[in-house]
Amino acid sequence: MVNKNILKIRKQLDKLDNKLLDVIKKRSLLVDVVIKNKKFKKDIVDKRRISIILRNISKKSKQKKIDTKITHKIWKSMIKAFIDYEYRNFK
């Protein structure tokens, strides 16, 4: 049986997950606007922008004392997912 402390912490994690979903939804809406402003499918992947984002996330992670391997993997995965989303929704 799982102890009560762990159950409390899991409830907090569930609340955070819901907040993350809200943030992802907001990000998706902004990406929709970006898609509408791109004229060509070849403009979807901006390697320079991706590099800047990952560098900034690494820097901010260090400042906040967050394991940079975690944030790097999360952001790379998110960027890849949103690039896929852009390709699927580009018109």
Language model feature labels by segment:
Residues 1-91:
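Domain-level signature for soluble enzymes in the chorismate/prephenate branch of the shikimate pathway
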